[in-house]
Structures are given as structure tokens and as C-alpha cells.
Amino acid sequence: MTEVTGPPSAAQPLFIMAMDQRDSFGTLFGVQGQPTGEQLAAMRSAKQLIFAGAQRASGMPLSGGRLGVLVDEQLGADVARLVREAGFELAMPVEASGTQQLTFEYGDDFPAHIEAFDPDWVKALVRFNPADPAGLRTAQTATLKRLNDYAVSSRRRWMLELLVPATRAQLAACEDQALYDELARPALTVQVIHELSDAGVDPGIWKLEGYETTEGARLVLDAVKSAGPPESACIVLGRNAPQHQVDHWLDIAAPLEGYVGFAVGRSNWRQPLIDYLAGHADRDETEARISEHYRHFVRTYLRADSAPPGEEESRSEPFGYTHPRLTPDREATIRKACAGADPRGTLLPAWMPQSLLAEVDALREEG
């Protein structure tokens, strides 16, 4: 693997095997409430299995890239202690698992837990929509600012995993998740980035959901570059999506200057682990499958990253484009649902796929 000489970049992208899930991980082991000692042991063993799968990819050609692991202390402390010795960068979460509002897993003691493992990256996950109640947004921003201040004072690098789930009104206006993801989420993400940056929250890396179009990805990337320090960058998260969907997101992101890798977890290991726990595969077979999924996404990213300039434009249409016809009335409904979350006017139609713009314009002329 490439020797680490600084933060990830286009020349040295970072490919993270994410396995920091805790509450959702427990559902695979039948956990209800607090896990038993037997369940804890099984989950910790499973995290070691996932890491073993990641290690099998360590000898693959990376074209300057580097590998990383994102793992939690609760279930993955043994893995965390082995990561850097194996040649991977270590990222660890600070947020409590399974909460809608961001809180620190270890409360005021979070710095001590970070320092005990000394990770290359500290990670926080937040769910944040500009249309959320003001009190919730203020509280979450304050928590992130506290982490940001700690990172600055201790000279630690940190990444923010930002999820922008639709409000009920936004989802109702879009009528389905696919339309929300394509036509509303990128612009709402821009608003979150500016709101957080204005409050002094400036992670080194924004860990973001994938975007269906080049226009959407560029919109968000431009916000990251304009709102925060110029060296800020983005990586793509996997969202437990099927392989073809993650491939599409990587195809969109990799050619764009400012995207510097990915952090994909369940799309690599969830189904192999389910099969292993059901007795349909042994440990060696499971490690091999996890490794191959991980390698696949690395190859996909590197192939897209090396595409000739301008080729990414051909990827603007989303994979499996099936959402309903966007009429002017629906456009107006989406705008209304997102009103107040879009003071900079970045919502539709400025970055919409050109095919949809032409369709809407034609309908306007007819009307």
C-alpha cells in the first residue's frame, strides 16, 4: 500500500471498510435491548471476521490509494488495535449508536477514549435536515462544534458522516424516496453544509450519501469547497445499497476533483455475514466474499477516477431511472415542501438533469 504522507487526495484516495455499526449490527444476532455475554462475544468475533476479509485485499494494486477501517470500540476494540499494524488507516466513531439526536457515546469522556486508541480519523454521524426543528438543529450543531474544537486543539483529523433524511412533508411532496434523493437531497445537503460551516463546524472530510447525478454531486462538492477550508474533501458512503447502486455512486463521484474515496460497510459484508451465521458458508469462504466485494468497489472507484476528462458527463442520468414524470405542479410542490430550507435558491431546477429540464420546459410551454 502507498505510504501515507498526508490527508487523502485525488492522488491518494482512501478506501475505508466501514464496520462501526452497533445497534443495527446487533439485529443480526437477535439482540433485543442489552446484548448477552454470548451475543457480545459473537458480535466481536464477527467484526474480526470482517477485518480478516479486509486484510485479504491489502495486496491489491491501489494506484496510489490507501486502505482504511472504520470500527467502534464497543464491539471492535480488538480490531482497532490491529488496524495500523496491518497497514490500514484507523477511523473510530464518537457518536452513540441508534439515536436520532447526536450525542457522544462516552459523554464528556469522549476525548479519553479517542486518545486511548489514537485513531487517524475521528468520525461523527449526524442526521440533519434544514427543515428540522430549530432547537434540534441548534443542539446538534453545538455538539459538532464541541467535537470540531477538540479536534483543532488536539490536532486530530475528523470526518463528519452527514445523513439528510427527508421530512414527512418533503417525502410526501416527492412521493417517493428516489425522487427525493435525486431532486431534493443534494440541495438540502448544501444548506446543511453552509449552516454547520457558518457555526464553525469544518471537518476535514465530509462522508456523504451517494448522488444520482453528476450535477447533484457537483452542487454539494462546490458547497464543501466554498463553505469550509479549501482542503476539505468528500468521500462516498454505501448506505447498505446493492452493488450496482454503489457502483453508480462511485462512478459519479470518483472523476470529480474533491472526492477522495469511499467508506462502504454493509454492502461489503452484510450478506456474507448473514450466510455465515446461518451456516451456509464457513469462515474462509466468508472472508473471501467480503474481500472480493471490497476489492470490487476499489476497482470501480479507480476505474472511474481514471476516466478521460468529461466522461463523467455521460453518467448524469441516474441508474435505473424510474421515478414518476416531473411535472411543473410537482416541481412547485417540492419547492413548497422545502421552502425555508433553501434561502440560497439552490433547489430545482438549476442542477436538474438536462433531460428533465427539457421535459419541464416543454410542459410549461404547453401550459
What would you call each of these model-derived segments?
Residues 84-95, 140-158, 185, 218-234, ...:
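Alpha-helix-loop-beta-strand connector modules within alpha/beta enzyme cores
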